[in-house]
UniProtKB/Swiss-Prot annotation:
Keyword Glycoprotein included in the entry's annotation: yes
Species, as recorded: Nicotiana tabacum
This protein's UniProt keywords: ATP-binding, Endoplasmic reticulum, Glycoprotein, Nucleotide-binding, Signal
Annotated region described as Disordered, given as residue ranges: 645-668
Protein name listed in UniProt: Luminal-binding protein 5
Residues spanned by motif Prevents secretion from ER: 665-668
Length: 668
């Protein structure tokens, strides 16, 4: 009962955001007339899947080979382009022109550590174009072409679209596409761009674990349940914790690793056999793309078999130099090779639990998604963490994400009818979003794990007298200083009426839409002038390693961050006091006509010395700034008090004015 009250209370706290979600939801329904049939696509690293909501239920659609999941592979031969099974099946004989794992490149920068690592592991060529990873490949007639990751992803999306069209007997233009929950803005934008290239209107981007939760919870009626979705796929890993209550799916927390999955486990098997071959045969096959292609295929097959068997034999005919390869691989060896990677999955689980504020015994169901969750060791680690609780195996781990996306498609198109009319999806932003204020401080507007869609406004002011332009620098990250966060984009708001510092009011509004994509607007309240920016994938977004580093460092260096922020605040307090004092003694409406000449001279001298000291002591400690403020106050405050007493007004120094929080705004 207490849990129910706690959840109700939190839903009240989210009332405004919830209203926003409901509003967005109602808009989606209004737009339903404009949308045709909306398919749901799980665009996976290794496999993709498509579904549609039809006749009151979801149909997962089989491809032209009769398979319900399609390899996310593309290949070029002298005669044609191949997608899916056809591409994967010829990989061993055409390795340099067969492209896979492109989801690991999408929305990333060429210099990302993960991209550089993948560059060494894949047989095709990854090149740098405008700071982004592109794939260089020979297409027909020896012509070389470079493709962006979005273009390759679009080819896979096109295949899924055509699969749905063949089944439905009509053209499809609208889709819901899923992404890992921990995908950042650049990766989401790039995925939407891939949809556009494929001729699709991506009506909604939704998070994979949330889609899986819909698949699990669609027919679950009755009371409130806390569920943990553990989504370990071919290339990405997500953990999301949700509350399901009569059709309302509210995400409480999400965490993950956008570069961890089954492909990494395959790679460990390959590395093991490469060493074994070198030892037994004195042959290094690590640069032989044909041999590696054959080995990769068998490593994946062996991994799958070891989920149900304790030993397999890896056999490859004519692996190199006419030598046939045949070696056993036990489940114990496989687990030993990947032990650190398996254990790595527990970190995001713990973090998500902390962020959700839940105890282990408050999780009602653990839902497994993604083919890699079939690995017994992964299931065992999860079971051990939750004190023996058995994971729920009621959803198909390969199809659950596409299933949930298809349900969302049914809601958007209106084809869901009564079965889906009560479903409301409340997802979250995975990273804190904010802007830079004076001293390089990260002023946070939208904290991580805030329910989306959401909108937050805050009023800021100018830092200098007569300032007519402010630069709005937008960051994401968990640290308190922007130098430790990631710049997403910046823009200038110009034409602000000249005024003393602290006078203009500039309202900055952050809006995150239902796809998790950010729009920022700045408006000068006096003139009504405004500028805005949509953060897009050309702004150089975070890599997963950077996200993890930021969160980890935020925890490790929280105390250090606090000290640096206190130092900046102390400097700003001193600076604000000095400027306020100078403004007052020169303003006829304030103190200019009430001061004796020697009093004015004392204040001018004290404030001038303080400003010179500030210029010479840019990196002073908090205590130094506090001490200097006391020195200036010791000169100025008695004079101000005397002036007020002479004029019969209430005493009160500029210090009190400068320290009032009610009307103060951070300076840009």
């Amino acid at each position: 009962m207490a849990g129910a009250w706690k959840r109700r209370a939190s839903l009240i706290v989210f009332a405004i955001v919830l209203f926003g979600s409901l509003f967005a939801f109602s808009i989606a329904k209004e737009e339903a007339t404009k949308l045709g049939t909306v398919i749901g696509i799980d665009l996976g690293t290794t496999y993709s899947c498509v579904g549609v909501y039809k006749n009151g239920h979801v149909e997962i659609i089989a491809n032209d080979q009769g398979n319900r999941i399609t390899p996310s592979w593309v290949a070029f031969t002298d005669g044609e382009r191949l997608i899916g099974e056809a591409a994967k099946n010829q990989a061993a004989v055409n390795p340099e022109r067969t492209i896979f794992d492109v989801k690991r490149l999408i929305g990333r920068k060429f210099d990302d550590k993960e991209v550089q690592r993948d560059k060494k592991l894949v047989p095709y060529e990854i090149v740098n174009k405008d700071g982004k990873p592109y794939i260089q490949v020979k297409i027909k007639d020896g012509e070389t072409k470079v493709f962006s990751p979005e273009e390759i992803s679009a080819m896979i999306l096109t295949k899924m679209k055509e699969t749905a069209e063949a089944y439905l007997g009509k053209k499809i233009k609208d889709a819901v596409v899923t992404v890992p929950a921990y995908f950042n803005d650049a990766q989401r934008q790039a995925t939407k761009d891939a949809g556009v290239i494929a001729g699709l209107n991506v009506a909604r981007i939704i998070n994979e674990p949330t889609a899986a939760a819909i698949a699990y919870g669609l027919d679950k009626k009755g009371g409130e349940k806390n569920i943990l979705v553990f989504d370990l796929g071919g290339g990405t890993f997500d953990v999301s914790i949700l509350t399901i209550d009569n059709g309302v799916f509210e995400v409480l927390a999400t965490n993950g690793d956008t570069h961890l999955g089954g492909e990494d486990f395959d790679q460990r098997i390959m590395e093991y056999f490469i060493k074994l071959i070198k030892k037994k045969h004195g042959k290094d096959i690590s640069k032989d793309n044909r041999a590696l292609g054959k080995l990769r295929r068998e490593a994946e097959r062996a991994k799958r078999a070891l989920s149900s068997q304790h030993q397999v034999r890896v056999e490859i005919e004519s692996l190199f130099d006419g030598v046939d390869f045949s070696e056993p691989l036990t489940r114990a060896r496989f687990e030993e090779l990947n032990n650190d990677l398996f254990r790595k999955t527990m970190g995001p689980v713990k973090k998500a639990m902390e962020d959700a504020g839940l105890e282990k015994n408050q999780i009602d169901e653990i839902v497994l998604v993604g083919g890699s969750t079939r690995i017994p060791k992964v299931q065992q680690l999860l079971k051990d963490y939750f004190d023996g609780k058995e994971p729920n195996k009621g959803v198909n781990p390969d199809e659950a994400v596409a299933y949930g996306a298809a349900v969302q498609g049914g809601i958007l198109s209106g084809e869901g009818g009564d079965e889906t009319k009560d479903i409301l999806l409340l997802d979250v932003a995975p990273l804190t979003l904010g802007i830079e204020t004076v001293g390089g401080v990260m002023t946070k507007l939208i904290p991580r794990n805030t329910v989306i869609p959401t909108k937050k406004s805050q009023v800021f002011t100018t830092y200098q007298d007569q300032q007519t332009t402010v630069t709005i620098s937008v960051f994401e990250g968990e640290r308190s200083l922007t130098k430790d966060c990631r710049l997403l984009g910046k823009f200038d708001l110009t034409g602000i009426a000249p005024a003393p510092r602290g006078t203009p009011q500039i309202e900055v509004t952050f809006e995150v839409d239902a796809n998790g994509i950010l729009n920022v607007k700045a408006e000068d309240k006096a003139s009504g002038k405004s500028e805005k920016i949509t953060i897009t994938n050309d702004k150089g977004r975070l890599s997963q390693e950077e996200i993890e580093r930021m969160v980890k460092e935020a925890e490790e260096f929280a105390e250090e961050d606090k000290k640096v922020k206190e130092r900046i605040d102390a400097r700003n307090s001193l600076e604000t006091y000095v400027y306020n004092m100078r403004n007052q003694i020169n303003d006829k409406d304030k103190l200019a006509d009430k001061l004796e000449s020697d009093e004015k001279e004392k204040i001018e001298t004290a404030t001038k010395e303080a400003l010179e000291w500030l210029d010479d002591n840019q990196s002073a400690e908090k205590e130094d700034y506090d001490e200097k403020l006391k020195e200036v106050e010791a000169v100025c405050n008695p004079i101000i008090t005397a002036v007020y007493q002479r004029s019969g007004g209430a005493p009160g120094g500029a210090s009190e004015e400068s320290n009032e929080d009610d009307d103060s705004h951070d300076e840009l």
